[in-house]
Each structure stands twice: as structure tokens, then as C-alpha cells.
């Protein structure tokens, strides 16, 4: 399983299938509510769009940074929350309403959404088939605004075999799952065409959720796509900083609370939030070190859930003064660095270089996590005693 697919599955469903997808969508609803609460709480700060007091202590600097990211990134945060919530909850609504819309045949709703299956095989061998390069060239001429991304064959050795070209259409927010052209494999005759442009308004809006949520802006053209993907990445990193700074401020405010329930909630927040980062980093490291025959199995999801649960269990069992968050973030940083080294080493031994973007990102994340853990350790260390000079009793 490639690392990108692994992270995508983690983001979509936490490796627990459709229930996990619904759960993740509920976190999208939570993000929308947090945005609303943040706007109400920080409504007086709209006049301080550039204030960041970095010279008056870490807590005040993080407070200002939290407000700045929330204000400047609010449109993207709302986009992340709304599209994330609609993705899973919309699928749940489709599943629940299918028996109402088609009482005799509930599965028909998925045929209406995704299109009919390819023509069935006739059991006769295919004597010759059209050249696929010529078919792609003809499809580009027939549909000039269509950009092919995926090609799949159905019943390739049968006379009824077909080929499907899936892609995107310029100016139409959709994905290759909904923009498809099907041709007969024998002679290249067009058998059918599916597009979100043929759907109603609400269905088109639902289809547009995925490209907007996952920064799939190819439908806008190369220039706009690259710019918006970069902005999307920056806002995603900003959202991570927003969560981290908000959690830190919340924990600091309740650090000295005498209530045992508050201390337990504080401990669980450290375990599950920092544990999520550590489990994801260790999963990436395990992906690099595991044998190839294990990559297609269910172990990545199980490993992630076990590691995350172990972090939550540690929050309950370890002493209250044990630096749990610091330890988990340090482990996550080391795992990110080790994963980058494990990926780069085989390439360097062959005298070649892979695409360095993912590895540089892992190295940067690892360095930042280790630095943060080190700064926490430094802040928690007792001040050094001043050296005694002279006679204080003189």
C-alpha cells in the first residue's frame, strides 16, 4: 500500500470502513462549530488582523497566532469542515434513503449515482481490438475539454469487451469517478458517456465535495491548480497549528486546576492528540520497514489503532507528572526522520534520487516535533541555582 493511499484511508475512515467515515465526518461538523465559536469569542479581534506579540512570552504569542490563523484562514477552515462533514454524512444519507427512493430495489440508487456496469461478456473471443493510443487521441478530439486520467478494460478478451476512459472536464468540479467515456473495445464505438454535468444541482454539489476537500483543482487548469493546491496546503498546515495552539492554551489554562476530572481530561487530551501524531508517524515508519507481502494486508490499520489506543491507555496508567505529550511528540519526530531515512537509503545505494517532496516534508515535520519536545523539556526543567560568590553574612 503506497504511503499516500495509507494516509488517504486514515483521513477518510480511520481504517474502520464506513463507520469510520461517518465518525470522521462528525469531526467536520465539530470543526464548523469550533469556527463559529471562535468567531464569536474573538469578534473583537477583527481590528487586530496583524497583531502578533512574539516578545511577551510563549502563551501570549500562541494566543495571537491562534487568532491570526483563525481569522485569515476562516474561509478555508469552513471549506474543510463543510466538505468533510458532507462527504461521509452525505453517503450515510444516501444509504438510509435508498430504500425510501427505491423500495423494491435499493441498490438502484448507486447505479443512478455511479452509472451502470459495463456490458456483460458474450462468451465469444475477441478477434482484434482498436489501438488504445488511437482511441485516446480520438477521445481528445471528440471531447476537447476532457483530460483523461485513468483507463480500464472490461472483459478484454471477449467480443463484448469495452474500455472506459475516466478523467476530468475543464471548468467542472468533479472527479474521474463521475466523468467517464465508455467505448467498444473491438471497433472504438462510443457506448456511453457519464458526466456530473448531466445531474441535478444537489447531486452536482455533492460530487464537487471531493475535489474541493482534497485539493483536486486540475479542472481549473495547470496555473490555477498549482496556486490553489499550494494555498490549500498552507491552510491545512495552518489548521494543524490552530489545533495545536488551541490545545496548548486550553491545557495551560487548566494545568493547575484541582478538580480530578479536569486533570483526567487534560491527560486524555495529551494521550489521544499527541498519540494520534505518534501513531501516524510510526505507521509511516512501519510501512518502510515491513516486508512487501504485508503491505496489502489489514495490518496497517490494525497497527495504527493499536498504537493510538496504547497512547490513550498510557494517559490513564502513567503517573500524572510523567511528560506524556513531550514523550509522544519526541517519538513522532524520531519516527518521521527514520521513515525518511528508510525511504531514501535504498535509492541512494543505487545512486539515484526519488521525488524529494515527501521525504523533505517528513524531515521538516520530524525536526519541528523534536524541537517542540525539546523546548517543552527545557521549559519544564527547574532553574539552575546561581553560583554563590562572596560572603552573604558579611
UniProtKB/Swiss-Prot annotation:
The keyword Cytoplasm does not apply. GO terms for cellular component: plasma membrane. The chain crosses the membrane at residues 22-42, 60-80, 81-101, 231-251, 271-291, 303-323, 328-348, 355-375. It comes from the Bacteria. InterPro entries: PepSY-ass_TM. The keyword Protein biosynthesis does not apply. Keywords: Cell membrane, Membrane, Transmembrane, Transmembrane helix. It is found in: Cell membrane. Pfam families: PepSY_TM. It is a multi-pass membrane protein. PANTHER family: IRON-REGULATED INNER MEMBRANE PROTEIN-RELATED, PEPSY DOMAIN-CONTAINING PROTEIN. This is Uncharacterized protein PA4219. It comes from Pseudomonas aeruginosa (strain ATCC 15692 / DSM 22644 / CIP 104116 / JCM 14847 / LMG 12228 / 1C / PRS 101 / PAO1).
Amino acid at each position: 500500500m503506497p504511503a499516500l493511499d495509507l494516509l488517504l484511508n486514515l483521513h477518510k475512515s480511520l481504517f474502520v470502513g464506513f463507520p469510520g467515515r461517518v465518525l470522521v465526518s462528525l469531526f467536520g461538523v465539530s470543526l464548523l462549530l469550533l469556527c463559529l465559536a471562535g468567531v464569536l469569542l474573538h469578534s473583537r479581534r477583527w481590528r487586530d488582523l496583524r497583531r502578533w506579540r512574539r516578545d511577551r512570552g510563549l502563551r501570549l504569542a500562541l494566543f495571537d497566532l491562534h487568532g491570526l490563523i483563525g481569522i485569515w484562514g476562516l474561509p478555508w477552515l469552513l471549506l474543510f469542515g463543510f466538505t468533510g462533514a458532507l462527504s461521509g454524512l452525505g453517503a450515510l444519507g444516501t444509504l438510509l434513503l435508498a430504500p425510501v427512493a427505491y423500495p423494491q430495489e435499493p441498490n438502484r440508487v448507486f447505479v443512478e449515482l455511479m452509472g451502470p456496469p459495463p456490458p456483460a461478456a458474450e462468451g465469444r473471443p475477441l478477434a482484434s481490438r482498436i489501438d488504445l493510443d488511437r482511441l485516446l487521441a480520438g477521445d481528445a478530439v471528440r471531447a476537447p475539454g476532457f483530460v483523461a486520467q485513468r483507463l480500464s478494460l472490461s472483459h478484454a478478451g471477449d467480443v463484448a469487451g469495452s474500455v472506459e476512459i475516466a478523467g476530468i472536464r475543464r471548468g467542472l468540479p468533479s472527479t474521474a469517478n463521475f466523468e467517464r467515456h465508455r467505448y467498444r473495445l473491438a471497433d472504438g464505438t462510443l457506448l456511453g458517456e457519464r458526466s456530473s454535468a448531466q445531474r441535478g444541482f444537489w447531486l452536482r454539489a455533492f460530487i464537487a465535495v471531493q475535489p474541493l476537500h482534497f485539493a483536486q483543482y486540475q479542472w481549473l487548469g495547470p496555473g490555477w491548480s498549482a496556486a490553489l493546491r499550494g494555498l490549500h496546503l498552507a491552510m491545512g498546515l495552518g489548521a494543524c497549528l490552530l489545533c495545536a495552539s488551541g490545545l496548548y492554551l486550553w491545557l495551560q489554562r487548566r494545568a493547575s486546576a484541582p478538580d480530578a476530572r479536569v486533570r483526567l481530561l487534560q491527560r486524555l487530551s495529551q494521550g489521544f492528540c499527541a498519540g494520534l501524531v505518534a501513531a501516524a508517524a510510526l505507521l509511516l515508519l512501519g510501512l518502510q520497514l515491513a516486508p512487501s507481502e504485508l503491505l496489502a494486508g489489514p495490518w496497517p490499520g490494525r497497527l495504527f489503532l493499536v498504537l493510538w489506543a496504547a497512547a490513550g491507555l498510557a494517559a490513564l496508567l502513567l503517573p500524572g507528572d510523567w511528560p506524556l505529550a513531550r514523550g509522544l511528540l519526541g517519538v513522532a519526530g524520531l519516527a518521521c526522520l527514520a521513515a525518511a531515512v528508510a525511504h531514501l537509503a535504498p535509492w541512494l545505494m543505487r545512486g539515484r534520487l526519488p521525488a524529494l517532496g515527501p521525504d523533505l516534508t517528513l524531515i521538516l515535520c520530524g525536526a519541528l516535533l523534536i524541537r517542540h519536545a525539546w523546548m517543552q523539556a527545557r521549559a519544564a526543567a527547574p532553574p539552575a541555582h546561581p553560583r554563590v560568590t562572596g560572603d552573604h553574612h558579611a
